[in-house]
């Protein structure tokens, strides 16, 4: 497989949807970003794309309730899933979000990879593990980003990284773990490399459409 290098700076917003029934047709290829409400998911997307306002960062964790789609090129999309695990959100809303997340991960056929973001100081909370379990169950590869890595000294960061790598072995899935910091740009290259790999598995029909478009 030839790895294609994508220009993530060209990524643009497409649509916000409450559930998978309101998303575009289930075709092309998608990589989803998931994490607790305070894990730094929006900041990671903004850093990846070098666009400060692409994904809205909220001062009130738990405010983002929709599935947000961003297009890199035709048929290649990044998906910002609703943040989870915020204590002050009503229980009914929590359950609604969890249903939407589970349904997307289990039923969206064009999903080819899942990026789960966790604060490096508080990794693998129950809902993080649930996301990983859902992904592994349907054979979706996972990249775990331990965010806010700049909050730890180099030695402590490496120790925490190794601890999480040991802890995820029982999940028995295709799971990679990397340290990440939007502020210090730690792990951004690793994220881009993984996305390029996943997106290089793009279906032939999408590649054909891109090629036809370039010839116009």
Swiss-Prot record:
GO terms for cellular component: cytosol. Its cofactor is Mg(2+). Disulfide bonds: none annotated. Keywords: Cell cycle, Cell division, GTP-binding, Magnesium, Metal-binding, Nucleotide-binding, Septation. Residues 27-201 form the EngB-type G domain. One of its GO terms (biological process) is division septum assembly. The keyword Zinc-finger does not apply. One of its GO terms (molecular function) is metal ion binding. CDD domains: YihA_EngB (cd01876). InterPro entries: G_ENGB_dom (IPR030393), GTP-bd (IPR006073), GTP-bd_ribosome_bio_YsxC (IPR019987), P-loop_NTPase (IPR027417). Mg(2+) binds at residues 42, 64. GTP binds at residues 35-42, 62-66, 80-83, 147-150, 180-182. Belongs to the TRAFAC class TrmE-Era-EngA-EngB-Septin-like GTPase superfamily. EngB GTPase family. Necessary for normal cell division and for the maintenance of normal septation. This is Probable GTP-binding protein EngB. It comes from Yersinia pestis.
